[in-house]
Amino acid sequence: MTAIQLIVGLGNPGAEYEQTRHNAGAFFVERIAAAQRVNLVPERKFFGLTGRFTHQGQDVRLLIPTTYMNRSGQAVAALAGFYRIPIESILVAHDELDLPPGVAKLKVGGGHGGHNGLRDIIAQLGNQNTFHRLRLGIGHPGDASKVSGFVLGRAPRAEQEKLDASIDFALGVLPDIFAGEWNRAMKNLHSQKA
């Protein structure tokens, strides 16, 4: 299995979106950066905040696009192209309506499931979807017409605590992910629920 060289955390830029459900992926990358003592700095040519650390001699780059969600692919394609990172070496962390808060799941490939950030990444990578995903459950409002307001809203405290716990679970399986032990990472992560 190809080693992960790029971890992307999806979200929207700006203070008004900072603590919204849609920024769950960005929360995950911020937590990795803090744990690795990496400063995320703006890089205009990559349309995002970037950082780098080394894990067992392998560079791992972090990216939080500063484009709006529906233009996330611009940042991912720019950074992956510049550093020649294979699509299979990318892990994208994002909010997931189809999972309840407190649940996180890993997935390889697949469609966008209506997620505009994933849709744009797939398009910008030449309609290739073989990157890895970390799906962070945020729950569903129950009615499709309420999705936009829901993802752009802040979670109540109890819900946010569950999301934070699922991010902790995901951070706990990063060593397996870096080792290419995807089955073990999935088994361990998928058995956790806040």
UniProtKB/Swiss-Prot annotation:
Any GO CC annotation of this UniProt entry: cytoplasm
EC number of the protein: 3.1.1.29
Pfam family, any one: Pept_tRNA_hydro
Catalysed reactions, as listed in the record: an N-acyl-L-alpha-aminoacyl-tRNA + H2O = an N-acyl-L-amino acid + a tRNA + H(+)
Family matches, as InterPro entries: Pept_tRNA_hydro (IPR001328), Pept_tRNA_hydro_CS (IPR018171), Pept_tRNA_hydro_sf (IPR036416)
Superkingdom, natural source: Bacteria
Principal location listed in the UniProt entry: cytoplasm
Cellular localisation: Cytoplasm
Swiss-Prot/TrEMBL site (Discriminates between blocked and unblocked aminoacyl-tRNA) positions: N12
Protein name: Peptidyl-tRNA hydrolase
Origin organism lineage: Bacteria, Pseudomonadati, Pseudomonadota, Gammaproteobacteria, Pseudomonadales
